[in-house]
């Protein structure tokens, strides 16, 4: 029997506000344990939460970016559970009325076609702290993360393969990152993914029993975990077994999933309305204000790059991988840079430099203005393409004018025949053996003179002009 794979994903994204959702503590990542905490985070008796307006702003932007309807009345609920990293013994979340609902995004499939993935809901909640289990037999609780604002984005079960799930996550991450509401870095925990997967016989409408997967710390592991579950569940069903509703974690070392617990339902959390927070009204003016702050998203930018700038689909995809890179490209083109030349530099030398340095493009000194000027002085013959690589490294580390650096460093390309011909004659005089080889007809003897000339000019001879002049002067020797 063959089975159809049914996948839905739950994505948590930490919002990059300065302070937490209900307390004034900093939400900054990477501080010493419990440095970013106060009495609200510790859940001291009598303290009350205070809503961070910036969190609502971010949630509205997310809902708009994901083509969602927005609830005009926002309220919160208590999700009750006990765990050491949750000192209140409940989490403030949204249950029956999320901020956004009925959304969708488009994903691109491997064959080049697109598919619409529906999004059921997007709701706000506070993050929990972090437990660390020491080798000394003690467990330690860090509440820095407690109260950091989260938006949870829950897809419909519209994905039919691990590859589609991977494509969905890639598209969703791009959109969220473009809004600026989250840096969506899985390595820092600001983006986390849970996957729900079930199988059903082809032709059956009813879903099978789902399994939830956790500990998916990369998009690659999401795909691997889902691939393992497809095989595990299919094998179990074919042998007459029954799939239980349970939570499993992906074990990267063993490339498989391991049972964590039998899955709880909503009733286990005893949701009820949060009594310490009021109802928040979201009017059309507020929504319009947030809509006006949204950028053009990757799909629209890719279409523009292909249709208006003549770039390939591959180039357009690479240039829109991050908003910072796309903005850099667009600024350079708006300043007069040739789109293909700018694209080639961003994907070639610049990408290699960034990878080697472990930096992003906003962390180096190069600006779009610098790059456009450098491309211009390559085009007008001031420097060669080879010399431009050296110029780029200087600009990446120090910034400044490309032309000014080239002139100060004596890197201007020599293209004047009146300057080059005497140097060629001197090369002939300094390399009599090579001249003799050439005159005697020795194979490839002429090629040595190119190297001699470039050495004599310290690499500054214009290669095209130099080749032309060398050919002329060598012909005179032969005559």
Swiss-Prot record:
InterPro entries: Asn/Gln-tRNA_amidoTrfase_suB/E, Asn/Gln-tRNA_Trfase_suB/E_cat, Asn/Gln_amidotransferase, Asn/Gln_tRNA_amidoTrase-B-like, GatB, GatB_C_1, GatB_Yqey_C_2, Gln-tRNA_amidoTrfase_suB_CS. It catalyses: L-glutamyl-tRNA(Gln) + L-glutamine + ATP + H2O = L-glutaminyl-tRNA(Gln) + L-glutamate + ADP + phosphate + H(+); L-aspartyl-tRNA(Asn) + L-glutamine + ATP + H2O = L-asparaginyl-tRNA(Asn) + L-glutamate + ADP + phosphate + 2 H(+). One of its GO terms (molecular function) is glutaminyl-tRNA synthase (glutamine-hydrolyzing) activity. Pfam families: GatB_N, GatB_Yqey. One of its GO terms (biological process) is translation. Transmembrane segments: none annotated. Keywords: ATP-binding, Ligase, Nucleotide-binding, Protein biosynthesis. Belongs to the GatB/GatE family. GatB subfamily. PANTHER family: GLUTAMYL-TRNA GLN AMIDOTRANSFERASE SUBUNIT B MITOCHONDRIAL AND PROKARYOTIC PET112-RELATED (PTHR11659), GLUTAMYL-TRNA(GLN) AMIDOTRANSFERASE SUBUNIT B, MITOCHONDRIAL (PTHR11659:SF0). This is Aspartyl/glutamyl-tRNA(Asn/Gln) amidotransferase subunit B. It comes from Streptococcus pyogenes serotype M6 (strain ATCC BAA-946 / MGAS10394). The lineage of its organism: Bacteria, Bacillati, Bacillota, Bacilli, Lactobacillales.
